[in-house]
Amino acid sequence: MVNYDMGVEGLARLRAEGAAHTVLDIREPQEVAICVIADSLCIPMQQIPQHLESLERDHPLVVLCHHGMRSDMVAEFLRNNGFENAWNLDGGIDAWARLIEPE
């Protein structure tokens, strides 16, 4: 299995630099209601196949869930469907909340 992980520091750097990217939050709505990264595109995991045509292919697509397990599967699915810039956010929203936005 190939590693398509991006650390939370890498995502924070993309955001700070203003680099084009999309954060794809694949958690369920009740999970997103607890904590979310600003400007995330929220599409539950089970709905991803129906939204492939609307997702950005030309810049990094960083997929996240709670800890990075579901998003790892989705990042691999996206890569297998032509999204060469799909990445799994290592540690998920949990790592983001602990290391980048602890408030």
Where is each model-derived feature located?
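Short, surface-exposed ligand- or partner-binding patches at beta-edge/loop junctions that are enriched
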Residues: L64
